[in-house]
Amino acid sequence: MKKVILSVSDKSGIVDFAKSLVGLDYELYSTGGTKRALDEAGVPVKSVSDLTQFDEIMDGRVKTLHPAVHGGILADRDKPEHLQQLKDKGIDLIDIVVVNLYPFKETVANPDVTEMDAIENIDIGGPTMLRAAAKNFKHVTTIVDPSDYDEVIEHIKNDSLDETFRKSLMIKVFEHTNDYDNAIVNFFKENKEPLRYGENPQQDAYFVRTSDAPNTIAGAKQLHGKQLSFNNIKDADATLALAKKFEEPAAVAVKHMNPCGVGVGSSIEEAFQNAYDADSQSIFGGIVAVNRPVTKELAEKLHSIFLEVVIAPSFTEEALEVLTKKKNIRLLEVEMTVDHDEKEYVSVSGGYLVQDKDTKTISRDDMKVVTKAEPTEEQWKAMELGWKVVPSVKSNAIILSNDHQTVGIGAGQMNRVGSAEIAIERAIEINDNVALVSDGFFPMDDTVELAAKAGIKAIIQPGGSIKDQDSIDMADKHGIAMVMTGVRHFKH
């Protein structure tokens, strides 16, 4: 019978996965909390101590660090001498290793974390098993990501758990352990950068880097300018996240954590001009991110206005010559790749919240036209642009957009109509090709009625209100095309 070791901190999906393995005639071995979870769910599982014939010691610090575990994982099954040594020592082969590590990043994200808390969340046995199994990917399947559970089961059922698939899992493992080790290094280097002050001058602050990945603000390469402030860092992070959403040339301007202008175009220069024209007043003193290299032509446009920070994947030498004439402007070089599995953390009194970042994307095929009127192609493009932007706007959020820029943004109001009124009032244009975009459903039809009075002919919103039909009827009354996505994008 083939053997599996399971030892996971993130227990999402582990019970169903374990049940599937048992159904496929695998014998399960586990440790600590994972074994308790499986026992409570009635899944047949043995203790790793049954393999090692050695009890856990030192409060669980030593559980799997044993030849009976690592011999069974590392044995090269193409070498008869390896198999003979296992037989001589009474060691069984291990075919699948399922491990994810102690939550070190989550632990050190707590501002009140102690060094001892951090130390106790440094995993030793987990990375050792992962690396051993990944090294032997020709013979052993290694799973570090719960999202791979279903695919692994399908491969087992289809007898396609081959070396190519195992190699793809191996790559994930080494990426994961590398990121894990970097987080530990960065924490214990005491990578706490004192800041001049926090959100306000009366607040002390510092910047703790838990990653130096080149696609993050923490890992950004600062090419010029003063030290980033607390508010610069927060705004820069929000600006970067939004710029990464676009594949076409795009420019994003942010003030106080809210976009004030977003533009796309056939060139990065055109995209920035569209973003600037979206709100040429609010961009003053803001932060701009572009997802293409900054050219001399773009640099001259940027140089003509006061900006705190410019973020880009790179700057040409000519662009730097222009921009560095301003002593204080911060220039950040950051990769524009997206990490879909990122977490975000929010401190609350007595603890902190952890959630996945809101990176869900949808296509037209996922959207539903609910009105008699169908959107035109121009309206579809306007809705798609606005739908990328609206998750970055404080709720309640209403955006007006065309196919190449935001034209009005209403953010952070306590009722949706209030945000719509602001977006309409500040709009640089309203015509048949402008769409109204809402981050949440309409509890009543008043926002649709307001849009109709303003001359808006296309709306996109999540839907899901018990009064959706009232909004649909109001849209039909005024010949408005309305699309529902089934996805909400609140931002607090």
Swiss-Prot record:
Residue ranges occupied by any MGS-like domain in the UniProt entry: 1-144
A GO BP entry: 'de novo' IMP biosynthetic process
Keyword Cytoplasm assigned: no
CDD domains from the UniProt entry: IMPCH (cd01421)
Cited HAMAP family: PurH
Transmembrane segments: none
Reaction(s) the record says it catalyses: (6R)-10-formyltetrahydrofolate + 5-amino-1-(5-phospho-beta-D-ribosyl)imidazole-4-carboxamide = 5-formamido-1-(5-phospho-D-ribosyl)imidazole-4-carboxamide + (6S)-5,6,7,8-tetrahydrofolate; IMP + H2O = 5-formamido-1-(5-phospho-D-ribosyl)imidazole-4-carboxamide
Transferase keyword on record: yes
One Gene Ontology CC term in the entry: cytosol
EC number(s) on file: 2.1.2.3, 3.5.4.10
GO terms, molecular function: IMP cyclohydrolase activity; phosphoribosylaminoimidazolecarboxamide formyltransferase activity
UniProt note: domains: The IMP cyclohydrolase activity resides in the N-terminal region.
Pathway: Purine metabolism; IMP biosynthesis via de novo pathway; 5-formamido-1-(5-phospho-D-ribosyl)imidazole-4-carboxamide from 5-amino-1-(5-phospho-D-ribosyl)imidazole-4-carboxamide (10-formyl THF route): step 1/1; Purine metabolism; IMP biosynthesis via de novo pathway; IMP from 5-formamido-1-(5-phospho-D-ribosyl)imidazole-4-carboxamide: step 1/1
Name listed for the protein in its UniProt record: Bifunctional purine biosynthesis protein PurH
Keywords: Hydrolase, Multifunctional enzyme, Purine biosynthesis, Transferase
InterPro entries to which the protein is assigned, alphabetical: AICAR_Tfase_dup_dom_sf, Cytidine_deaminase-like, MGS-like_dom, MGS-like_dom_sf, PurH-like
Protein family membership: Belongs to the PurH family.
Lineage: Bacteria, Bacillati, Bacillota, Bacilli, Bacillales
Organism in which the protein naturally occurs: Staphylococcus carnosus (strain TM300)
Taxonomic superkingdom: Bacteria
